[in-house]
Structure formats: C-alpha cells, structure tokens
C-alpha cells in the first residue's frame, strides 16, 4: 500500500486509484474497514523502525498539528504527528508518533474548568512521552521541538525523563519573581548575532535575516487559573532558559522575525544560544511534511471517505509515505550518508542505476555525484525524474514526489522485462 500511495501521490489519494482495478479496490476497502487494523498499530510500526535508527544520534522530535478535514457542522479532524530529525545534519529519521482528534467550535469556553487530562492540549505532552522512546532506544540526546501552540505549563512541569524541551513562547507568562517573561530580554545586553535564511511564506518572500541574540535563566510560575486539585500536583515554578532572537533591520514592508524560545537545555554562551535557534529552525521540516501530505502532494484534505475510521487509516498511511518523500529530500546532498534501504527495497538498486545512467549528461553537473547504493544516489535520480535539471536550485518535496511517481511507473515496466 505504501508504494501505491507514493505512486498516486501527485494525483491525490483515492481508494479506486490505489486499487487500480476492482479486485484491488475491494482489498484496499477491506483493509481500511478491518477493525483489527488500527491507526495506532500502523504508527507504532513506523515508530519502531525510527527508534532502530536513533542510536547514538542527537534527535529532534518535532511535533505540530494540522487540519486534515475541514469543519463540517463545527467539527473538523486534526492530525498531530511527531517526526524525528537528526539535529546535526537535518536528516529525516522517520515518524515517531501520530494521532487524530476532532476540533469542535465553542470548546474554548470552559477550558479552564477541565482537568489537563481531559484537554486536547494533552497531546503535546503525549508527543513528548513518545519521543522519550527514542532515548530508551539509545539516542544520545532527544530534544522535543514545538511551536507556540505547545507552550503549556504541564509540558515543562511533567517533562518525561530522557528528553529536553524547546518551545517557542506563546504567552507572556508570569515569572516567580513577579515580572513578566517578555520583558526579560529588554533588560539584557545583546549577546551576539547570527544570520539565518527565512523560507518564503504567504505574503513574504524568502530572505536572509540578521538576528540579535539574548538569553537568560527564567523561572516560570505556575498559572493561577489552574484548578486547585490538579495544580497541587504541579510544581510552583519551573526553571528554564529563555533565548530571544530578534531580527535587526527587517524589510520596510515586512514583520521582523522575533522568536522567544524556552528550553530545558543549558545555555552558557552565545554559541549555545545559536545552537538552540538552529534547533528551532529545523521545525520547518514538519511544515514541509504537511505541504507534501496536503494540497501540493497527497491532497488528503480532498479525501471522500465519510467514516472517520477508514479516513484516519488512509491519512496515516499517506503520512508514512510523505515521510519517505521528505527523507529523500533531506538526503539529496548525501550529508547523512544513509543507505538505499532506508526508503527502497534492495531489488530497486539495479533499476535506479540503469535510470541514472540514462539521465546523466556529459558535464560534471549532469553526473550523479553520489555513491551507488546510497539514498542520496536515489534522491538524485528521483529529482531528475521529477523535472530538476541539476543546474538551478535544489529539488524540494513536490519535485521528489513527482520523481517517485515516475519511478514507480518505470519500476512496473522494469519488473515485467523478463516476463
């Protein structure tokens, strides 16, 4: 099913397309409706494979939420995945965990009266708990990376053993000394600067930004509105480090990049602060995953499955396939020196080598520069199949997906060559 999802990715996911014929369609439908097949089992299988590749590595466990089904009668379906990324070279290691939940209009009312265990925000702590499995599997370090929606007191106070936290501050929290979080950096001298490339976003072209860095220890106070019974189990404060990165001289028609990052990592000098900002910037990886999963790739938002169970299984399978696409993108330069078997069957090697020989030109830039048997070698082949010329820019997820679609079509003919 994984291969067929990749093959159909650029056309959107449909059971009829996946099945290819009536018999195949029935098999896929039975799989999706089989109560013995669960999303948790599918995700757990992918997670075991990811854990097997984590030993000795500093892993960023990046988590975020995206809507995969728009609200109907005020109810929408959201997906919350956790992916593992190598903190040093940016290699996508794989999927750690994923879950679905419904978002209902009006739920924000009364949220302060609910226990944390009953809130949807519990998913952020659950994601960190699954990330701790990477540490148990031998990862040298695990850092959970979250955007502002993950700025939850319990996320820090109940942090699982074996992981560090890195969260972009989403609210001006009260500190134990009575001051406010956002005012802290204003009292500090600039510790140093760094330049970062900001990717394009809606209404904002890509640019290079110069960031002024400041950092200091902070002690976050327990929120006053927590229910008494639940709050009694939480510490009165949590000691963290605040790292602020504020853009200097932003474009006149743009908004300055301004990140306030809370972390459990020790930050002793400006080099440590730059490292923390670098970890946070890797969060863009999960945005690329969502882009591949949705309109620009598998188009899961257009799925016509009416029942939640089969719908979630099909989205989960698409998520696993989209993660494979992202692995190829991140290994296009061969930095991680990953083997072909990370994303391909061993028997695919001969086909990839034959296609590479056919695609290579006479100039050095038209030659596949990567060793045979490596994932980078396959990434170059798929990028060329997806329309990349080898001269301009670097191939992204959509180009790689188009290349995978073509490769699976070629592979079908390759497998029939001796029939």
How should these model regions be labeled?
Residues 1-62, 66, 70-78, 83-419:
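Single, function-defining residue in the core of a domain
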């Amino acid at each position: 099913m994984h291969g067929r999802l990749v093959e159909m990715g650029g056309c959107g996911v449909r059971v009829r397309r996946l099945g290819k014929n009536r018999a195949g369609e029935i098999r896929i439908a039975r799989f999706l409706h089989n109560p013995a097949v669960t999303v948790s089992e599918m995700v757990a299988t992918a997670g075991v494979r990811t854990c097997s590749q984590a030993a000795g590595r500093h892993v960023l466990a990046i988590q975020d939420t995206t809507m995969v089904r728009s609200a109907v009668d005020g109810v929408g379906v959201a997906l919350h995945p956790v992916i593992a990324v190598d903190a040093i070279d940016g290699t996508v290691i794989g999927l750690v965990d994923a879950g679905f939940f419904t978002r209902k209009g009006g739920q924000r009312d009364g949220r302060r009266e609910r226990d944390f265990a009953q809130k949807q925000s519990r998913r952020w702590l659950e994601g960190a708990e699954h990330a701790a499995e990477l540490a148990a599997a031998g990862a040298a370090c695990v850092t959970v990376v979250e955007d502002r929606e993950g700025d939850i007191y319990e996320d820090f106070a109940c942090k699982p053993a074996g992981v560090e936290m890195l969260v972009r501050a989403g609210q001006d929290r009260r500190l134990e000394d009575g001051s406010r979080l956002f005012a802290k950096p204003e009292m500090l001298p600039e510790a140093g600067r760094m330049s970062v490339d900001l990717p394009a976003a809606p209404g904002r072209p890509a640019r290079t930004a110069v960031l002024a860095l400041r950092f200091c220890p902070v002690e976050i106070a327990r929120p006053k509105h927590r229910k008494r019974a639940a709050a009694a189990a939480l510490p009165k404060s949590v000691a963290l480090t605040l790292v602020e990165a504020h853009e200097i001289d932003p474009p006149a028609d743009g908004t300055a990049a301004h990140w306030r990052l809370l972390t459990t990592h020790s930050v002793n000098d400006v080099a440590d602060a730059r490292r923390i900002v670098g970890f946070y910037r890797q969060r863009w990886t999960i945005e690329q995953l969502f882009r591949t999963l949705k309109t620009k790739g598998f188009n899961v938002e257009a799925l016509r499955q009416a029942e939640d169970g089969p719908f979630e299984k099909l989205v989960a399978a698409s998520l696993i396939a989209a993660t494979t696409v992202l692995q190829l993108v991140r290994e296009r330069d061969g930095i991680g020196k990953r083997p072909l078997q990370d994303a391909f069957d061993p028997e695919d090697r001969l086909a990839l080598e034959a296609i590479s020989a056919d695609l290579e030109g006479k100039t050095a830039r038209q030659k596949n520069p990567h060793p045979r048997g490596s994932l980078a070698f396959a990434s170059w082949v798929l990028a060329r199949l997806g329309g990349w010329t080898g001269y301009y820019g670097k191939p992204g997820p959509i180009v790689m997906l188009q290349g995978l679609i073509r490769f699976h079509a070629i592979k079908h003919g390759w497998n029939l060559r001796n029939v």
